Amino acid sequence: MKRISFILIVLVFLGLYLFTYNSNSSFLDIENKQTLFTSVSKPSWKIEMQNTKDSFELHSLTAKQEENKRVFLLDEPIFRSNWENKFKSSASSVYAILDLGEEKLLMTNNVHLTITEKDEKIDLFSEKINFDMRNKNFRSKNQVQIRTASFRLNSNGFDLYQNLDGVNELIFSKAAFEENNASKNNFYGEADLIIYKSPSDTFTLKGSAEIKIESSLISAEEIEFNFKTKKIISSKRSKIIKS
């Protein structure tokens, strides 16, 4: 009986030892998997693209770099770009992620992008914007609001890029716009896709396109509209309804 009791006591202590050992091992594994960051105060970057006159500048209040990676987490970033000394933009937000390896910047939370080309200035607001510096492409799939001296525009996202002719195009998805002036003769328009070539005074509306001017509603497959002169330049398969 004493022999059996002794064996049981040994087994109990052995079980406790193994349980304690495994617990500590798991804890050590979790500890080793923790991500390490290096923090920097008020960092700055200047990125110049090879064989072009394009340049980008980035400043932030703080930056945290994940160990052994070229990825930075930024607080209160300010981003500026110059495309061949013609197109300029600046952007600010609450947070951002900079990937130097991919040459990409993701800005989030209260993003304000200002685009300037010649005498045209556009203010764009969203909660998230992706900046692809290598391909000179800015885009967002979030709700976007645009404000200019002439109009306001809301859309379900945008895409800014430079086409083969070197012209900057802003493309808006499921967009609607209206004139800033609250007058009887103000205009309103909407379409599945709205294209704005910067700098210009025209919109190209594609897919379920509608323009309302004064007492007339024009619906068409495609409409080219000058928002400065309030004139329709051209349209495809259109019909006019007067109220």
Summary of predicted features, one role per range:
Residues M1-S243:
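Mature-chain termini and adjacent capping regions
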